[in-house]
Amino acid sequence: VAKTPTVEHDLREISTPKGALRYYDCGPESGPVLLFLHGSGPGVTGWRNFRGVLPTFAERFRCLILEFPGFGVSDDFGGHPMVTAFGTVSPFLDALGVDKVHIVGNSMGGGVGINFAIANPDRVGRLVTIGGIGTNIFSPSPSEGIRLLQEFVEDPTRQRLVDWLKSMVYDQSLVTDELAEERWSLATDPATLDAARRMYGKAAFAAMNSAMAASDRPLPWAVMHKLTVPTLLTWGRDDRVSPPDMALIPMRTIPDAELHIFPNSGHWAMIEAKEAFESTVLAFLSRGNG
């Protein structure tokens, strides 16, 4: 069993005009830099998304876990947390004096990573996404996991949180009382809940869909042909938040993309398929000098 790294309480911060960005920094200082970008959802943090795989990656890489604003660790910058997240990567890396990174982005973090890599192709070596990007082709939208997330955000109860957590995983036994309690305490923090409602409340979701329908700008999945860095798309076969049919457009349109689907795994492939995820991603990151 992988030993939990000793960086749990080594939370650092940088100041920005909008508030503090907090992050973890571990692994060899002289190693290539691997930036982890977390997903969204009740009680999420970068640390919780990636603490399990950190010991493996920190052996070879300087690992940075950025905590996005509005999720209870970094300050809340206001606005739509997903939109805010897009603007944090460049100033974060600039403040640390880091020129180039590999990126592992989970769900929303994958979208942030793609956006950053399209805008800054010279700053990204290789990019790994975990579910959550693309668009539904055959599966209904919103997905089961997103609907359960909306229900929790509208009216938070422990049972709704457990129902949502169970939609995140293939192995239902992973949703323990301990996990639910850990998520509940942060998810129901008033400021964090307010930020979640700005993103996943039914009114916010409807407003976002209306804005996208009225916009002349292409939707995120329609600009992925502009992504030039080598990209590994990873997915859980049994993902009920972002079903695997969402991978088809990114797989076809990203020029240098490969797709790896893990069996018996839901939206948290890096947790449910930990060893296979680690070996697959390490092999990809170790290929070439990019």
Q: Which sequence ranges carry the predicted segments?
A:
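Conserved HGGG/HGGXW glycine-rich cap/lid loop of the alpha/beta-hydrolase fold
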Residues: 17-73
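Active-site loop/oxyanion-hole signature of alpha/beta-hydrolase fold enzymes
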Residues: 54-55, 65-104, 279-282
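Gly/Ala-rich beta-loop-alpha elbow adjacent to hydrolase catalytic centers
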Residues: 105, 109, 113
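Flexible "cap/lid" loop of the alpha/beta hydrolase fold
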Residues: 114, 118, 125-163
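Conserved alpha/beta-hydrolase catalytic His-Asp/Glu region
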Residues: 140, 157-223
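Short beta-strand/loop motif that positions the catalytic acidic residue
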Residues: 227, 233-235
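Acidic catalytic loop of the alpha/beta-hydrolase fold
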Residues: 238-242
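Catalytic active-site module of serine/aspartate enzymes centered on a nucleophile-bearing elbow/loop
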Residues: 257-290
